[in-house]
Amino acid sequence: MVTIIAGIILSGGKGERIGGKKPFRVFNGKYLINYPSDILKSLNIPFVTVFAKNSIDLEMEKEYLTKYKCLISFDLIEGKGPLMGILCGMRVLNAKWFVVLPCDCPYINKEALKKLISNISIAEKNNNLCIIPKHENGYIEPLFALYKRDALSILNKIIMEDKNLSIRYFISYLNPLYIKAEELDESKRIFKNINTIEELMDNE
């Protein structure tokens, strides 16, 4: 049975600026990884979390799996960026659409995600293979977005060619549906990610 929507949480970054093991850094009493996981769980969206190889120890893995009972995967090849994480997620779960979220955005909320998902019917009519929030200045949020399973063959080809692994390059083949970022959240705070120890402390 094919699920309509599944989630992919990208947790493959090294997180060197935050001291490593970024998904399990504590922010306001919760691991960073718990924020997107809690939202997906609350919406009953099945999801997979993709980690970098050797990035978490067995105790962390066990604790996370016990809490969320989700699937986990690891980057098949290191150093390929978020495209590899999306590829791994799409291979693990059988869904028509995938909502891709980063592990380091603690301000994500349920309403914003529901608004993003509400655009699927428009994308289906227009043959868009992805739905991407876009800011007024043209900046896009490709890691807080939806990708259709039909994009998997394109993604496979790009990774196999290994010439341009930019996510913008990938999106250029997908006839993207751009939606206004402020329509998801007027403050745009949901897109703020935590990259350093200072940001971890300042934002508490």
From Swiss-Prot:
Binding-site residues, GTP: 10-12, 22, 75, 104
Cofactor(s) required, per the database record: Mg(2+)
Positions contributing to Mg(2+) binding: 104
Domain of life: Archaea
UniProt-listed CDD domains: MobA
Pfam families: NTP_transf_3
Record GO terms (molecular function): GTP binding; metal ion binding; molybdenum cofactor guanylyltransferase activity; nucleotidyltransferase activity
Subcellular location: Cytoplasm
Keyword Lyase in record: no
One example of a Gene Ontology biological process annotation: Mo-molybdopterin cofactor biosynthetic process
Record's function text: Transfers a GMP moiety from GTP to Mo-molybdopterin (Mo-MPT) cofactor (Moco or molybdenum cofactor) to form Mo-molybdopterin guanine dinucleotide (Mo-MGD) cofactor.
Family stated for the protein in its record: Belongs to the MobA family.
Protein name: Probable molybdenum cofactor guanylyltransferase
Organism annotation: Methanocaldococcus jannaschii (strain ATCC 43067 / DSM 2661 / JAL-1 / JCM 10045 / NBRC 100440)
